[in-house]
Amino acid sequence: MSEAIRLTQLSHGGGCGCKIAPAVLAEMLKTLPQAQLFPDLLVGHETADDAAVYRLNDEQAIVATTDFFMPIVDDPFDFGRIAATNAISDIYAMGGKPILALAIVGMPVNTLPIAAIQKIMEGGASVCAVAGIPLAGGHTIDAPEPIYGLVALGLVHPQRVKKNSAARAGDVLVLGKPLGVGILGSTMKAGKLDAEAYRQLIDTTTQLNTVGTALGALDAVHALTDVTGFGLLGHLLEICRGSGLSARIEAGRLPLLPAAVEFAKQGIGPGAIGRNLASFGDAVAFDAAVPEWQRRVMADAQTSGGLLAAVAPDSVDEVLALFHAQGFAAACVVGELQAGEPRVGVVA
């Protein structure tokens, strides 16, 4: 980590915790026109999916997304890596394969040394190289706070697109990465994160969700999303609302970053936790036995979080094997979808 520059002190928020709260975002989007005039637009903004999908022909559709945010860590290179990993994840979350990226760069050029900005951009480029795609260009502006991210493009078969609206009653919910990223990010901003906790933070946030491409080829994976700024509960609610289903989550089965547990019990976390919980309202019901710290973890804003898959029950073992084979050791079953009103019930 850089000792000379603390990127997290140059911004008011960090990572996907910068997202506007779900309820506020929904209000903002109300006046946007629907997309009925574009029959080849397979996925637009109406279903809260991770990316737009536009059919090119019977065999190919383009997946398009953009994602950017302010620093969640102090090290410039790591910030670039995390932001790029997070942006490309949306392609995988649609079942697609990334093909190209463009950089989005907003930097306080009179405050932040050029060398630090270069490291941020190099970090992003390094992740694109791992993903096997070119960082082909981008756009830069002078901004009061550091902002970095990508436009990412990918390809998917039009019949293999994984939408939030396609989950089915009885589907089992599989989560690919442990929770607690936002909590560790807030701990770092407070200057309380040790080297081991930082390693856990970096390891999970720079792991590309490459398994999404393989999951996209499976008919048994009915819906797929990545868990980011709205937390596990918020993104699960998007699936519930899109598919007209209810969900049941078992808090005791959730994979957690070990270093995040104690900080969560201390009440440390981003402001997005409170905003998310307030936005859920009565759409989320917690069993009395679920402790407050676990409730906060489930609403914690994840940056570059894991994939959440809705899977046919008889294919759960196959899906878990795919996750584990690609290095997602924490992947596990966390709940199920049921017929009912779009809401989430959480039991201990």
Question: What do the predicted segments below correspond to?
Answer:
Residues 1-348:
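Helix-biased detector of long, well-ordered alpha-helical tracts
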